Amino acid sequence: MEFVFLGTGAGVPSKGRNVSAIALQLLEERGGTWLFDCGEATQHQILHTSVRPRRIEKIFITHLHGDHIFGLPGLLGSRSFQGGTTPLTVYGPKGIEQFIEVALSVSTTHVKYPLEIVEITEEGIVFEDKQFYVETKRLSHGIECFGYRIVEKDIQGPLLVEKLREANVKPGPIFKRLKDGEIVELEDGRVLDGKDFIGPPQKGRIITILGDTRYCDASRILAQDADVLVHEATFAAADQTQAHDYFHSTTEQAARIALEANVKRLILTHISSRYQGDMYKELLREAKAVFAHTEIAMDLKSFPVER
């Protein structure tokens, strides 16, 4: 599991930062990639990374401001030309379906793969399978905006092969049955319960990715005990009034959420273009003064998510 930040700027692109897009690479876990937001030129940024559009299986849109969605029609269209044939699902607030359908229709763009659009109308779980579930809550922004909590379900512990050997159980198909938790009768009449030969489960990881937001309770709830929190930090601490007026957060406010939610690691993104060059170092210093385990995202930078 790995983050690839495709765009870390706010509002408009700058020379150093493109607008919002984050790829969550799940290649080892499920052979695919999830994209969070898709600002203008996202597909161009992808060209400089290991992300493959044909492997993108889900796109989660936080809200419908242009710096988070204007790259979506182009990416959806190009995916067809880049070998994308597998289904793709787009999740987002009410209006995302109309935006996509109008953009593709007016430009006579035809996708050659199954495309599903899910409009989020209620808070709660928007996706779940055997590996993950994704939960969402409304944040505090000028328009409807969601944050996403991605929870990896606990992974079954390993088969205790040495314990089986000590019990004089020979390798073979029986190992798989025991690993599947079956109760198995051996040729000598012994009955083994697979659960007795499986190690403790490996705890799944929790990732929280927030859209644009003021400091709010929903952010803290979504981030509770997360391994990684990705939080916007549009403004420096001194610009708190502007942050509030424009429905955004400061570096210190993002760090406070991380501290209050007991997260392990905070990554700041959505940095205003007013902070150029090495000014990001001061933003990072402000956040670290509140929450030590803070990093700041840069375009095309990768962050592995450790267990």
UniProtKB/Swiss-Prot annotation:
Its EC number is 3.1.26.11. The keyword Nuclease applies. The active site is at D67. Signal peptide: none annotated. It comes from the Bacteria. Zn(2+) 1 binds at H63, H65, H141, D212. Homodimer. Zinc phosphodiesterase, which displays some tRNA 3'-processing endonuclease activity. Probably involved in tRNA maturation, by removing a 3'-trailer from precursor tRNA. This is Ribonuclease Z. It comes from Bacillus cytotoxicus (strain DSM 22905 / CIP 110041 / 391-98 / NVH 391-98).
